[in-house]
Regions:
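Positively charged n-region of N-terminal signal peptides that target proteins for export
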Residues: 1-5
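Bacterial N-terminal signal peptides
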Residues: 7-18
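Flexible coil segments in periplasmic/lumen-exposed cytochrome c-class electron-transfer proteins
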Residues: 24-94, 133-252, 287-322
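Short, cysteine/histidine-rich loop/knuckle motifs that typically chelate Zn2+
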Residues: 98, 255
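Cys/His-rich metal-chelating microdomains
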Residues: 102, 259
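Short cysteine/histidine-rich zinc-coordinating motifs and their immediately flanking basic loops
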Residues: 107-113, 265-271
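Catalytic nucleophile-loop/oxyanion-hole region of alpha/beta-hydrolase
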Residues: 113, 117, 150-152
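Short microdomains enriched in Cys/His and/or Lys/Arg
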Residues: 116-129, 274-285
Length: 322
């Protein structure tokens, strides 16, 4: 509790200065906000039951794409799913476990919510519902679905989902690799996937986060793993920023998010989470599209960050055990 009070006190002090949100002059980085091309089409379902390693379950592609049916390949990995997580409520409240997976590990296109504080999850749903939390790239479908769901879901359903996901232990599913060259990629459904053939290109200051096994990820296997390619030196640069704020550029992340970035009380942990997602959140905070009640605590800390800073912070956080 003392740590939380200290974090809040720091936030109040920081917020005593005028909050200036950066104008949208610098376009959102396309690699962090992948948008499906106009001709994007899902492969047709031939009705064949699909399988993933270490599971006796079988599902078709149609089932994998059903927004009201959370595929549960590994039911022994977690407690029983609440109805709102497993099936949602038609027509407007999709199953939480579809995008976030049955036990919350997510994909690069959305948030990992396993182990997040219940209070934080409840507040984010309120922010999506009120319009306080949007996105810097409105054409992206994942945040559109969150906003639609938040407007239709009941408080009781939110509490059920928040209690379930907050009680789960997050798992390490990301391998962070510093490299000067990365696989060439394509947008494969609001996320990036490596092109077949092994062609590479310069990383050029980006984070390129891709599934290790594309088919498993598209089948919503919660045990899917990812590789996040980050620029050389970015993890150490991020560690310095997180621990000392870059000599006045920002407040140290560790004050509010904890010494290992695992969170403090209602403040979410960042360790082991998708670096692509983290960059989007930093950018959205900086540009005012994420503006809930706790956002004023973040605004002074992100206003002076460059995109390279965001990449470094996200790379460092993702490299830590959740």
């Amino acid at each position: 509790m003392k740590a939380i009070q200290a974090a809040l006190a720091l936030g109040v002090a920081l917020c005593a200065t005028p909050l200036i949100v950066r104008a949208q002059a610098d376009a959102p980085p396309a690699w962090a906000y992948p948008v499906n091309p106009p001709d994007f089409k899902l492969s047709p379902d031939d009705g064949t039951p699909r399988h993933v390693p270490d599971s006796t379950a079988a599902f078709t592609l149609t089932q994998a794409r059903d927004l009201f049916f959370a595929l549960d390949w590994h039911p022994s990995d977690h407690p029983p799913l609440p109805e709102i997580v497993a099936h949602g409520r038609k027509p407007d409240v999709m199953a939480c476990g579809v995008c976030h997976r049955a036990d919350g590990p997510r994909g690069p296109e959305n948030a990992s919510i396993a182990g997040l504080p219940a209070q934080y999850i409840v507040q984010q749903m309120a922010d999506f519902k009120s319009g306080a939390r949007t996105t810097s790239v409105p054409q992206r479908i994942p945040p559109q679905l969150m906003i639609k769901t938040a407007k239709g879901i009941t408080d009781a359903e939110i509490e059920q989902a928040a209690a379930y996901f907050s009680g789960l232990k997050p798992r390490a599913v990301i391998k962070v690799v510093e490299t000067a060259t990365v696989p060439k990629t394509r947008v494969a459904g609001w996320f990036l996937a490596a092109l077949p053939g092994g062609e590479t290109e310069p990383i050029a200051g980006r984070i390129m986060e891709v599934p290790e096994d594309l088919e498993r990820f598209e089948l919503r296997d919660a045990r899917s793993h990812f590789v996040a390619y980050v620029p050389p030196g970015s993890i150490e640069q991020g560690r310095q920023l997180a621990s000392n704020g870059g000599n006045g550029k920002s407040a140290p992340c560790t004050i509010c998010h904890g010494p290992e970035l695992n969170g403090v009380g209602p403040i979410p942990g960042l360790a082991g989470r998708s670096p692509s997602y983290l960059v989007r959140q930093l950018y959205d905070f900086q540009h005012g599209t994420r503006a809930g009640p706790w956002s004023p605590l973040m605004a002074p800390d992100v206003i002076n960050l460059t995109l390279d800073d965001m990449v470094a912070l996200a790379a460092y956080a993702a490299s830590l055990p959740p």
